[in-house]
């Protein structure tokens, strides 16, 4: 069954008398529908010409009216109306690689999907985006999105992510910035790899994209006992956590002076590891990175 095949029609849907389960959504106002982003974007308007394809292959177009931004009331085989895009990286710090065996299969799926970034807040690395997808994000103004940056040095980022394409991320982020796309970013900080001077460089490069780089969280690498055969990583010590806090907060202070916003925030875990008190509420401004363990 095609992913854009309708599985259910809401009783209050403006298409309740025209659409049936098993019909395929072909286009809205002449725009082909390939996934949930197309569907939500083109179904936003109040006046719609909806093309449906019956199971026998015949097509018909239905004209409907609804409130601006109102739902069409259609459900599909999957939420994305497509397969989720899987991760093409081999990150040295991947948390899924460190999970215990014997858990449900869905926990081992590595997604790296711009649609889930926009709709669900998942982080994406940009390494598996085609040129068409980059252009579509800009054209549809899919914003804000969450980007896992980790480093802006091309060679270092390629190493961290285990992907030679990873070095092109800053170039894509500049295109998104020029296209009006807001990005919230994260840096998984690994002692001896992307900390210190490399972290300073990454923050400097990302600050150059403010305000489209709206916020950046610095999160300590998480390590479990299930690391056999994986790259040897070093956990944060209290001293190293304190050094990282000082580096990031000093840079954030400069951003406050320059932009009126801190932009860069350390995860609560670094404060706890360093034995320091968490900052006051006003320090976290909009709490943009709350779900990434910042300001909880």
Label the model's feature ranges:
Residues 59, 66-212, 222-247:
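Conserved Radical SAM active-site core
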Residues 244-257, 263-264:
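C-terminal accessory region of radical SAM enzymes
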Residues 193, 213-240, 259-282:
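Flexible glycine/acidic-rich beta-alpha junction loops that bind and position SAM and/or redox cofactors
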Residues 16-34:
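Conserved PDZ fold ligand-binding element
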Residues 274-296:
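Active-site loop ensemble at the mouth of alpha/beta enzyme cores that anchors a bound cofactor
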Residues 1-10, 14-15:
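PDZ/PDZ-like groove recognition
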Residues 40-76:
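PDZ-domain C-terminal substructure recognizer with occasional recognition of PDZ-binding tails
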Residues 12-18, 40-41:
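Short, surface-exposed secondary-structure edge patches
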């Amino acid at each position: 069954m095609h992913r854009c095949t309708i599985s259910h029609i809401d009783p209050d849907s403006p298409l309740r008398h025209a659409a049936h389960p098993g019909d395929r959504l072909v286009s809205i106002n002449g725009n082909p529908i390939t996934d949930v982003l197309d569907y939500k974007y083109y179904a936003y308007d109040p006046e719609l010409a909806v093309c449906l394809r019956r199971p026998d292959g015949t097509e018909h177009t239905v004209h409907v009216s609804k409130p601006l931004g109102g739902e069409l009331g259609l459900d599909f085989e999957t939420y994305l109306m497509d397969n989720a895009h899987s991760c093409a990286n081999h990150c040295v710090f991947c948390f899924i690689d460190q999970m215990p065996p014997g858990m449900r299969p869905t926990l081992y799926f590595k997604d790296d999907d711009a649609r889930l970034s926009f709709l669900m807040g998942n982080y994406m690395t940009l390494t598996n985006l085609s040129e068409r997808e980059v252009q579509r994000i800009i054209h549809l103004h899919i914003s804000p999105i969450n980007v896992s940056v980790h480093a802006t040095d091309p060679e270092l980022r390629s190493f961290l992510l285990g992907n030679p394409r990873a070095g092109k991320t800053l170039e894509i982020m500049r295109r998104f910035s020029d296209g009006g796309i807001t990005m919230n970013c994260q840096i998984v900080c690994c002692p001896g790899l992307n900390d210190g001077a490399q972290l300073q460089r990454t923050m400097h490069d990302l600050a150059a994209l403010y305000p489209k780089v709206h916020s950046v969280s610095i999160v300590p690498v998480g390590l479990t006992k299930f690391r056999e055969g994986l790259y040897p990583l070093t956990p944060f010590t209290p001293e190293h956590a304190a050094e990282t806090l000082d580096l990031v907060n000093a840079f954030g202070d400069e951003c406050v002076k320059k932009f009126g916003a801190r932009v860069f925030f350390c995860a609560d875990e670094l404060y706890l590891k360093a034995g320091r008190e968490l900052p006051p509420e006003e320090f976290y401004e909009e709490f943009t990175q709350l779900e990434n363990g910042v300001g909880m």
